C-alpha cells in the first residue's frame, strides 16, 4: 500500500514538474508553507533526487540508442554511396559497350557517317578562345574525321597546331616526328595525390588521336612546360570522380598498374575532358579494327595474274599448290561463327564473362587443327579485339577500387576467367593486389579503444582470418597452375605480415606497454599464426624475424627498470627481518613465493608474522622471477643470448650488493643475517632461475651454472661505497 502511494506521489510530482506553467520559485514557496517540518522537506528532496536520477538514466539511454542508430545509419549510407558509385561505373561501361555494337554490326554505315563528318568538318570555320582550339582539333567522331593523306586543310591545320604547342614542351621533340598524329584537345589541369587527395602540381594535358601527353608547368617561364608522361590510349581508362566538396570537378585516369587524379577548371571543362577521351578512344579502336580488316583481306588478283602470264611455269611447281588450295577451305559459314563477334560484344556488355570465354573456347577448339587462310585470320583479328576488351573488364573487376566487402570469394569469377584466357600471371598479381588492399582496409578500420590486449585480439582475428581465407581461395583458384603463382603468394604473405607487424608494434611496443602486456599480445599473435599450419602455411619464422628488434628493445628496457629498482632498494637496505604484521599477509607472500618456484620458503618464516629474510632480497626474487616468466612467453631462438645476458646482469646486481655488505658489516648479528640472505640467493633463488630457464628454453644455460657454482662470492673493491664494481 505504501509502495503504491509512493509511486502515485512520484507520478504526480513528475506531472507537476513537466507542466508547461511550472514556476520553480512559486513551487518552493508553496512547498515550504505546506510542509510540517524538516522531515517532510527531506523526504520531498529525496523524491526529487530520485526523479532526477531516473530522468538522467532515461536521457542517457535515449542518447545512446540514438547514437547507435546514427552510427548504423551513417555506415549504411557510406555503403550505399560506394555501391551507387560502382553502379555508375557499370552503367558507363555498358553504355560504352552498347554504343560500340552498332559500329561493329554496321561498318558501312559507320564509314559513311565518318565520311559525312569529315566533309562537314572541313567546312567549319574557326572561333575564338577554347572553341577556336576545338574547332581546329576538337571533338572528332573518329580519328579519320579529317583527311588522312595530308592534302586537306583540316589535317594541315591540326598538324601545325600540334607542332606549335609541342614546341612549348621540353623533352618531347620525338613526338613531332610521328606521322599522322594530330591534336584533339588540350587544357590546364591540377594533379592530386590518389591516396591523400593533396594537391601535387599544375599540369597541362595534350590529347592526341592515339595518346595522351601530360606536361608539368614551369613556374620560371610563362607558357612553357616540361614533359612528364605519355600514355597510349589503348591501355588508358577514364573514371569519373564523384564531387565531394571541396574536392570537385575531378576525374581519374587508370594506367595499369598506376592511377592519377586530375581536377579541371570547372564542371564544363571536366565534362569535355571525359567526353573527348571516350570519343577518341572509341575512334582509335574503330580505326585499328578497320586496318586489321584491310590487312586480312585476300589478295587474289595478283596471284591469278602472275600464274596466267607465266607460260613457262612447270607442272612440278603446280603439284604442291593443289593441296595448298584444299587446305585453305575452312567452313566459316556456320551461324554461330558468323554471329560470334556480335555475341561476344553482347556477353561483355551483359557482364556474362563465362559465356564469352565459353564462346572463345568453342572457337579455338574448332580452329585448333585448321589452317589459317585470310578469312580465318580476319575472324581471329575480330575476336582478338573482343578478347582485349574482355581482359580489360576483368582486370577492372579485380582492381582495388572495386568493392572489397565480398571477401576473396568475390574475385573468383574474374580470376577463373582470366586463367581460362591464358592470363594466369596477371590474374595472380591482380588477385593478390586486391586482397592486400582488403587487408589494409580492414586493419585501418579497426578502432583503437579500450585495453591494448583487446585491440590485439581484434587485430589478430581480422588479419589472420583474412589471410586464411585468402590462402584457401588462392588454392582453389590457382590449383593446377604454374608453381610460380605459389611463390608469388608466399612473397605476398610476407608483405602482408609486415603490414600486420607494423600495426601490432605501433600499439604494443611504441606505446610503452608493460612487459606482461607485450608478452600476452605476442602470445596471441603466435597462436593465431600457428593456425595457418592447418593449410600448410608456416609464417612463424617471419613474425619472429619482424618482431625480434622490438622484443629486444622491450627486454632491455624492462631489465634497466629492474636494475634501477634493485639499486634503489639496495641504497636503503637496513638488513632487518620482514614483519608482515598479519597472518593473511604472510600467507599471501607464501603463495607468491610458491608461484615463483620457491617451494622451501617455509623454512625462512619465523614466529608470528616474521620472515628471516630481507625485504630487498624478497622483492628482488619476485621481480626477477616475474621478468623471467614474461620473457619466456616472448622467447624464440633469436632472443636466447639477449634474455640470458639480461638475467645475468640483474642477478649480478643483487649478488654484488650482498658481497659488499658482508665485507663492510661489522655487527656479528647483522653479518649472520646477511649470510642467511646470501645462502637464500645462491642455494634457492639461482637454482630456481636456472631450472625455469632450462624448462622454458629447452637447454641449460652455462652462464647461470657458472654463476651458481662459483666457489666464492664475487670480489668487489672494499673501499667502494656502491654495490656494483
Curated annotation (Swiss-Prot):
Residues 312-328 have a biased composition (Acidic residues). Residues 182-282 form the PH domain. The modification Phosphothreonine is found at residue 142. The modification Phosphoserine is found at residue 19. InterPro entries: Cullin_repeat-like_dom_sf, Exo84, Exo84_C, Exo84_C_1, Exo84_C_2, PH-like_dom_sf, PH_domain. It comes from the Eukaryota. Residues 137-159, 285-328 are annotated as: Disordered. One of its GO terms (molecular function) is phosphatidylinositol binding. Its main location: cytoplasm. Belongs to the EXO84 family. It is linked to Neurodevelopmental disorder with microcephaly, seizures, and brain atrophy: An autosomal recessive neurodevelopmental disorder characterized by severe global developmental delay, developmental regression with loss of milestones, severe microcephaly, and brain abnormalities, primarily cerebral atrophy and hypoplasia of the corpus callosum. Affected individuals develop seizures in the first year of life. Death in childhood may occur. Component of the exocyst complex involved in the docking of exocytic vesicles with fusion sites on the plasma membrane. The exocyst complex is composed of EXOC1, EXOC2, EXOC3, EXOC4, EXOC5, EXOC6, EXOC7 and EXOC8. Interacts (via PH domain) with GTP-bound RALA and RALB. Interacts with SH3BP1; required for the localization of both SH3BP1 and the exocyst to the leading edge of migrating cells. This is Exocyst complex component 8.
Amino acid at each position: 500500500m505504501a509502495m503504491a502511494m509512493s509511486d502515485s506521489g512520484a507520478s504526480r510530482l513528475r506531472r507537476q514538474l513537466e507542466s508547461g506553467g511550472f514556476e520553480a520559485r512559486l513551487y518552493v514557496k508553496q512547498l515550504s508553507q505546506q510542509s510540517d517540518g524538516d522531515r517532510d522537506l527531506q523526504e520531498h528532496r529525496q523524491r526529487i533526487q530520485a526523479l532526477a536520477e531516473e530522468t538522467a538514466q532515461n536521457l542517457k539511454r535515449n542518447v545512446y540508442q540514438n547514437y547507435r542508430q546514427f552510427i548504423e545509419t551513417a555506415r549504411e549510407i557510406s555503403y550505399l554511396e560506394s555501391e551507387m558509385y560502382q553502379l555508375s561505373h557499370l552503367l558507363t561501361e555498358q553504355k560504352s559497350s552498347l554504343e560500340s555494337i552498332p559500329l561493329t554490326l554496321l561498318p558501312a554505315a559507320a564509314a559513311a557517317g565518318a565520311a559525312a563528318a569529315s566533309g562537314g568538318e572541313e567546312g567549319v570555320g574557326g572561333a575564338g578562345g577554347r572553341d577556336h582550339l576545338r574547332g581546329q582539333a576538337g571533338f572528332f567522331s573518329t580519328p579519320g574525321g579529317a583527311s588522312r593523306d595530308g592534302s586537306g586543310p583540316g589535317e594541315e591545320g591540326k598538324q601545325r597546331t600540334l607542332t606549335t604547342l609541342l614546341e612549348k614542351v621540353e623533352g618531347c621533340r620525338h613526338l613531332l616526328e610521328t606521322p599522322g598524329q594530330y591534336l584533339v584537345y588540350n587544357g590546364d589541369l591540377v594533379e592530386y595525390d590518389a591516396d591523400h587527395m593533396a594537391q601535387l602540381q599544375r599540369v597541362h594535358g595534350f590529347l592526341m588521336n592515339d595518346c595522351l601527353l601530360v606536361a608539368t608547368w614551369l613556374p620560371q617561364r610563362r607558357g612553357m612546360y616540361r614533359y612528364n608522361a605519355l600514355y597510349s590510349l589503348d591501355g588508358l581508362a577514364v573514371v569519373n570522380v564523384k564531387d565531394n566538396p571541396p574536392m570537385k570537378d575531378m576525374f581519374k585516369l587508370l594506367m595499369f598498374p598506376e592511377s592519377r587524379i586530375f581536377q579541371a577548371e570547372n564542371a564544363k571543362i571536366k565534362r569535355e575532358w571525359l567526353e573527348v577521351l571516350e570519343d577518341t578512344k572509341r575512334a582509335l579502336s574503330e580505326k585499328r579494327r578497320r586496318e586489321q580488316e584491310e590487312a586480312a583481306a585476300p589478295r587474289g588478283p595478283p596471284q591469278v595474274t602472275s600464274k596466267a602470264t607465266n607460260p613457262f611455269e612447270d607442272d612440278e611447281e603446280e603439284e604442291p599448290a593443289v593441296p595448298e588450295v584444299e587446305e585453305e577451305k575452312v567452313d566459316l559459314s556456320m551461324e554461330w561463327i558468323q554471329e560470334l563477334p556480335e555475341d561476344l560484344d553482347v556477353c561483355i556488355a551483359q557482364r556474362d564473362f563465362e559465356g564469352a570465354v565459353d564462346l572463345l573456347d568453342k572457337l579455338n577448339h574448332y580452329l585448333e587443327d585448321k589452317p589459317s587462310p585470310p578469312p580465318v585470320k580476319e575472324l581471329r583479328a575480330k575476336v582478338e579485339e573482343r578478347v582485349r576488351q574482355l581482359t580489360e573488364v576483368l582486370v577492372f573487376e579485380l582492381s582495388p577500387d572495386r568493392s572489397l566487402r565480398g571477401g576473396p570469394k568475390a574475385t573468383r569469377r574474374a580470376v577463373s576467367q582470366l586463367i581460362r584466357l591464358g592470363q594466369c600471371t596477371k590474374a595472380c598479381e591482380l588477385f593478390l593486389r586486391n586482397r592486400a588492399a582488403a587487408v589494409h582496409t580492414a586493419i585501418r578500420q579497426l578502432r583503437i579503444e579500450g585495453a591494448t590486449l583487446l585491440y590485439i585480439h581484434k587485430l589478430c582475428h581480422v588479419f589472420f582470418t583474412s589471410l586464411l581465407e585468402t590462402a584457401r581461395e588462392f588454392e582453389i583458384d590457382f590449383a593446377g597452375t604454374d608453381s610460380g603463382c605459389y611463390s608469388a603468394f608466399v612473397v605476398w604473405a610476407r608483405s602482408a605480415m609486415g603490414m600486420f607487424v607494423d600495426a601490432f608494434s605501433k600499439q604494443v611496443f611504441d606505446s610503452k606497454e608493460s612487459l606482461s602486456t607485450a608478452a600476452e599480445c605476442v602470445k596471441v599473435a603466435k597462436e593465431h599464426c600457428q593456425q595457418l599450419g592447418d593449410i600448410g602455411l608456416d609464417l612463424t619464422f617471419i613474425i619472429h624475424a619482424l618482431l625480434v628488434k622490438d622484443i629486444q628493445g622491450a627486454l632491455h628496457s624492462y631489465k634497466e627498470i629492474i636494475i634501477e629498482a634493485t639499486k634503489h632498494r639496495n641504497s636503503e637496505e637496513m638488513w632487518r627481518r620482514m614483519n608482515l604484521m598479519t597472518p593473511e599477509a604472510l600467507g599471501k607472500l607464501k603463495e607468491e613465493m610458491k608461484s615463483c618456484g620457491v617451494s622451501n620458503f617455509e623454512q625462512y618464516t619465523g614466529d608470528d608474522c616474521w620472515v628471516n629474510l630481507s625485504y630487498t632480497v624478497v622483492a628482488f626474487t619476485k621481480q626477477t622471477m616475474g621478468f623471467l616468466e614474461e620473457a619466456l612467453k616472448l622467447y624464440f631462438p633469436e632472443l636466447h643470448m639477449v634474455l640470458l645476458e639480461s638475467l645475468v646482469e640483474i642477478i649480478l646486481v643483487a649478488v654484488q650488493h650482498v658481497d659488499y655488505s658482508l665485507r663492510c658489516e661489522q655487527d656479528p648479528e647483522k653479518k649472520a643475517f646477511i649470510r642467511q640472505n646470501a645462502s637464500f640467493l645462491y642455494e634457492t633463488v639461482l637454482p630456481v632461475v636456472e631450472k625455469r630457464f632450462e624448462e622454458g628454453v629447452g637447454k641449460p644455460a652455462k652462464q647461470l651454472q657458472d654463476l651458481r657454482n662459483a666457489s666464492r662470492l664475487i670480489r668487489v673493491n672494499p673501499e667502494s661505497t656502491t654495490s656494483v664494481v
